[in-house]
Amino acid sequence: MGGGPAGLTAAYLLAKKGVSVTVLEADPDYLGGISKTVSYKGFCCDIGGHRFFSKSDEVVELWNEILDEDFIKRPRKSRIYYKKKFFDYPLKPRNALFNLGVFESALCVLSYLKARAFPVRNPANFEQWVSNRFGSRLFSIFFKSYTEKVWGMKCSEISADWAAQRIKGLSLWSAVKNAVFGAGGSSGGEVIKTLIDSFHYPRKGPGMMWESAGRKIEKWGGVIKMGQEAVRISKTKDGYDVVSRSPGGEEFHYEADFVISSAPIREFVGCLEPAPPADVTGAANALSYRDFLIVGLVVKDRDIFDDNWVYIHDPSVKVGRIQNFKSWSPDMVPEAGKNCYGMEYFCFEGDGIWASADEDLIKLASEELVTLGLAREGDITDGFVVRQKKAYPVYDDKYADNVETVRAALAGSYPGLCPVGRNGMHKYNNQDHAMMTAMLTVENILAGKDVYDVWKVNQDAEYIEEARDSDSGGRDVPKTA
């Protein structure tokens, strides 16, 4: 269930072993889930901005196996836009000092020293976690506005788990060390994902990887059904009966020994028949998600900025981040003298942004791009809108308990139902983590027993054999057969 990185990784590895697989993907046009590439008049749009970087050699090997020569190396450059100025990210002290000014920089240093001397013990929310590592003043400058745009909630209401997973290992000191010694630190230390200076990328966006995986799955006898969404999963004597529905309302039945689901937990649990106990369905329904849309703007290319993306820390505009698709890969832009920017807006399905007409969103994005100084009046020649439901699982103060309730119920009463990936496990991690959960699920299926607890895969796509603090390391994942 699901044709994103997790679902397709599982199908790819199983089909390669000769196992009969069927992939149900609700999108009628694109494979890749939130890692798809949307094409508009030849302009390629990466709807979420996907760097292909992993500490897991196994994941990297699989990427190279799937795509091979179309998997290119690209420089990483991103900056923060704050008070009409661009700040390098990772932090470069001279740049930050110049942009902030001596007085503001001194206040930031004092705030950082105070945080180190008097940290919040056992930080429970995002604001506390980040302030402990950067100081409250830098938190307010470089984290607060953007993060609250992403989640639509105050930083004090966001679980510290999200910060620990997304910016693990990063602090003001590590950023300064990176500026002086490079991403590996002064002694060749561990690379922090947030600080990498290059990454690999498919020539025409992440969807190119997953479309290639789909073709190979079908070559090995696997079946991919586009435009079919699972609506019921019923236990049978030998496994499960999965019912999918097409956009036209036609239903299809599939018999399965195992069901691997990367669908959002809330939807997945809602498909189960008979329904699980009330506490389980209640826990699933209590999980929430943040939705997302991107406005693609085709512009005259004036080389105003060459970042892969720019984080907008300006509360006067609604855009949260701007992607520069030509900087991801020149092959994503088909016309000389043109570029395509992706204006990212975070929202909830049905709210004002989400429900706006495409022409209104294109007008809003165009005005904000000019206001920010990243385009001139008359530079924007075309535009399009892509909406993505349930792009981000929300980490509120109850999410961990709710996920555990569902996980325990599935493990105890539904053998052979295997949640994987970001939404399938309600873990806001990158695609290498999603892929590793699928890889280990396949290992369990092929072994005929639970060799690995997939829930122990950490944010770095590493398998942790014993419970440890989220900042601890783990051994490399086992090689698949």
List each model region and its residues.
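N-terminal Rossmann-like FAD-binding beta1-loop-alpha1 element of flavoenzymes
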Residues: 1-23
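Conserved Rossmann-like nucleotide-cofactor binding loop
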Residues: 6, 29, 266
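Active-site/ligand-binding neighborhood in enzyme catalytic cores
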Residues: 9, 96, 106-234, 239, ...
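Glycine-rich FAD pyrophosphate-binding loop
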Residues: 15-39
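Short phosphate-binding/catalytic loops that engage adenosine nucleotides
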Residues: 19, 222, 374
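Dinucleotide-binding Rossmann-like beta1-alpha1 core, especially the glycine-rich loop
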Residues: 41-118
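C-terminal segments that line or cap access tunnels to active or ligand-binding sites in enzymes
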Residues: 256-258, 262-436, 443-455, 466-469
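Acidic, Ser/Thr-rich low-complexity intrinsically disordered segments
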Residues: 463-481
